[in-house]
């Protein structure tokens, strides 16, 4: 496990695996890696994101798969995310001729310190080709769910950041004959676009 932007072994492993699959991985920002699948047929560009960094914590689980690196552990599952992204890359490469559009694979560093995505965004993550939509995933370590369970939020619900925003719209009541003297919170809330 490696922490933050200091991921030389992880980045090298990802780039080597992608190259062996037939990709031409690209560096993005301080330590991110990008690869493109498809692009031979017209269509949209979908970004598939997975993070790679570990936590600066000494692992004391005693498990046979416990970290052997002092003071660093994958306690949040990003090692699984990296493996899952490489698995997706393999499947996408095997079916590349069937892809309409492009899938941009993003291997993100520094998620745990809330800096990796911003660094990659500032360095062209969403360009060349321009990204139309993004998909991310996260394992739920410690959740009492059956093996193989996938949780998918309802339509329009996303959480690909470390923050949530809660917006409260306050209005001012009045009479329907004088809408100019009122503040309708329902109309205002319906017009908020984030």
Positions of PLM-derived features:
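Acidic/His- and Gly-rich active-site-bordering loop/insert found
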Residues: 1-74, 83-100
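Short, glycine/acidic-enriched loop or turn micro-motifs at the edges of active sites
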Residues: 54-56, 78, 141
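Histidine/acidic-residue-rich, glycine-tolerant segments that coordinate divalent metal ions
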Residues: 63-73, 80, 92, 97-194
